[in-house]
Every structure is written in C-alpha cells, then in structure tokens.
Amino acid sequence: MDFELDDSEKSFRDEVRAWLKANAPKDDSTEANQEKVIENRRAWQKKLYEAGYVGITWPKEYGGRGGDFMDQLIFNDEMIVAQTPEPINVIGLGMGGPVVIAHGTEEQKKRYLPPLL
C-alpha cells in the first residue's frame, strides 16, 4: 500500500502549512479566563471559515469546501503540527453537521448547516 501523498495532496498540505504559519494563534489551553478562550475560539473558527478551512468535506452549496476526507486529514495533521487551538464548534463540525448532510432534508441542511460553520 502506498501511503505517500500525491502531488495535489502535497500542494494542499503546503498551502495549509503556509496559511497556518501566517495566521494561527497561539494555543490558549492554559488561559484561565474561559470567556476569553471562548471568544478566541470563535474568532479562530471565523478566520478558518473565511479561509476555506472549516467544513472541508462539506458540500460547497452548504458553505463547505467540497473537499475529500484526505484533505480533512491533511488539514488536521497540519493543525496538530502547528499546535493551534481547535475551532469553537468541533462537535458540530465533526459530528452534527455530517449527520445533517447524510440524513437531513434539503430544508434542514439549509437551515442548520451554515450556522455550524
């Protein structure tokens, strides 16, 4: 089995790595003020969304990037390497949204997915 990234995956990895290097905030996990942590994480998720890195595997018509699972894995790996904080809505992005995408009606998708991003 070949576990090497192909050229497009390497290109995406390099894009993400450069963007995170230029934009990632410091990890705030030691911040005592939880309100500040929540504020920071919301701002971070907004910045990630505006750059196209939230909802990577979600369909474009619901605000996602339309990427594949490998794109998401590459992004997750680069977030770990860069030691960035998680976005505020990790559960909604990773669990809630995908359930709505898979099983929701068109009306539910339009109503519930965009606010999760």
Q: How should each PLM-predicted stretch be described?
A:
Residues 1-13:
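Intrinsic disorder at enzyme termini
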Residues 13, 17-21:
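Structural signal for well-ordered, non-membrane alpha-helices
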